[in-house]
């Protein structure tokens, strides 16, 4: 991973630790996690929440915070949010298998 990628990953980790609820899990997946990224690759983020989803305002705040973090850096952050139960129900999907195969835990 380049110094720039390490810097961006560090900023994502810090933001996640600051804004996500206790017991949330933040993972990096896709080409950035597999160390196959090009300079234009986006940052794919999976956020898992314990229990029920929070209010729509909280949900929007988390999504917007991660997306807007990338703007001054010239990178695209793509967060997706599920509860742990919703995520477990996706175990048979190719998306689940792809994420779990090459993910990097950022916040837990």
Q: Which ranges hold each PLM region?
A:
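Catalytic core of pol beta-like nucleotidyltransferases
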Residues: 1-27, 33-39, 49-108
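Short, conserved active-site loops that position catalytic residues or coordinate cofactors/metal ions
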Residues: 41-43
């Amino acid at each position: 991973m380049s110094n720039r990628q390490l810097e961006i990953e560090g900023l994502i980790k810090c933001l996640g630790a600051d804004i996500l609820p206790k017991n949330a899990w933040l993972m990096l997946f896709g080409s950035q996690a597999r160390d196959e990224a090009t300079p234009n690759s986006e940052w794919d983020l999976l956020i898992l929440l314990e229990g029920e989803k929070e209010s729509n305002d909280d949900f929007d705040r988390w999504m917007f915070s991660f997306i807007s973090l990338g703007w001054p850096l010239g990178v695209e952050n793509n967060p997706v949010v599920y509860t742990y139960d919703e995520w477990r129900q996706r175990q048979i999907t190719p998306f689940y298998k792809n994420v779990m195969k090459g993910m990097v835990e950022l916040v837990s």
